Amino acid sequence: MNVPHSVKSRADAYWRLMRFDKPIGIFLLLWPALWALWIAGEGRPDPGVAAVIVFGVVLMRAAGCVINDYADREFDPHVERTRLRPIAAGEVTSKEALILFMVLCLTAFALVLTMNWLTIALSVPGAFLAASYPFTKRYTHLPQAYLGLAFGWAIPMTFAAQTGSIPVVAWALYAATVLWALIYDTMYAMVDREDDVKIGIKSTAILFGKYDREIIGALQIAMLAILAGIGRYLGLGGLYALGLAAAAGFSVYQQVLIFRREKSKCFRAFLNNHWFGAAVFAGLFADYLWAG
């Protein structure tokens, strides 16, 4: 059966609005959730919990993209990189975007309802963080830090779902994830810095100014120190350390990429964070597997 072209076009617009054509954002959300899942489950996470966390991450990342484009609908047409986004280009209306956002959030909440009460309770501030983040760039130069709070919220939820509690190590991992989001989203904001200044959007890339590379470097060191401290606290071994060493290598490579602040290379540095997250998870996975 042939699908009408208009239906295909609409489906494609919704697909792009949810950024399913650009899965990097899913991975940046998913890796910390998987770190938490493996630590909370001591290398043997509950399959049901794992499924809810993974699908929940995918749904809420899509919801976050939709509400972000809704919030930025007046700005996106004036930025070269975002002017062809579905709402900015008139392919999807604001009303349709809000309906899609609600459907995605309700679907994710339906998944959470299969978990314990602590996880359900934690989903409320999580939804608030996701929905409010896009509006912060109007009022503060720290929207990237707020994004970290939103992206990292999967960590306490994962510990709650897996163990029924949120131990100190969960909050340490949350802190590392907030720093990580601050790092990679600042790299992302460096791409749009000139356009953002013109239209009045705030970001850490603008706030940090000529010290952006140095501050990113300090944040990278702090994040790696927290991750190393978590490994020591949990008694993890050499394989985890090897994963962290690989992650540190990716951090150095990212510094090389952003050295001249070229837009294309700043964007490559942002994308490279996928491999940072993968390296940390590989170290965790291998260490728990080796320990049996």
Swiss-Prot record:
InterPro entries given in the database record: HB_polyprenyltransferase-like, Prenyltransferase, UbiA_prenyltransferase, UbiA_prenylTrfase_CS, UbiA_sf
Subcellular location: Cell inner membrane
UniProt-listed Pfam families: UbiA
Cofactor(s) essential for the protein: Mg(2+)
CC annotations in GO: plasma membrane
Transmembrane segments: 23-43, 47-67, 98-118, 141-161, 164-184, 211-231, 233-253, 270-290
Keywords linked to the UniProt accession: Cell inner membrane, Cell membrane, Magnesium, Membrane, Transferase, Transmembrane, Transmembrane helix, Ubiquinone biosynthesis
Enzyme Commission number(s) of this protein: 2.5.1.39
Catalytic activity: all-trans-octaprenyl diphosphate + 4-hydroxybenzoate = 4-hydroxy-3-(all-trans-octaprenyl)benzoate + diphosphate
Metabolic or biological pathway, per its Swiss-Prot or TrEMBL entry: Cofactor biosynthesis; ubiquinone biosynthesis
A GO term for molecular function: 4-hydroxybenzoate polyprenyltransferase activity
Disulfide bonds: none
GO terms classed as biological process: ubiquinone biosynthetic process
Similarity annotation: Belongs to the UbiA prenyltransferase family.
Job of this protein: Catalyzes the prenylation of para-hydroxybenzoate (PHB) with an all-trans polyprenyl group. Mediates the second step in the final reaction sequence of ubiquinone-8 (UQ-8) biosynthesis, which is the condensation of the polyisoprenoid side chain with PHB, generating the first membrane-bound Q intermediate 3-octaprenyl-4-hydroxybenzoate.
PANTHER family for the chain: 4-HYDROXYBENZOATE POLYPRENYLTRANSFERASE, MITOCHONDRIAL, PRENYLTRANSFERASES
Protein name: 4-hydroxybenzoate octaprenyltransferase
Species per Swiss-Prot/TrEMBL record: Methylococcus capsulatus (strain ATCC 33009 / NCIMB 11132 / Bath)
This protein's encoding gene: ubiA
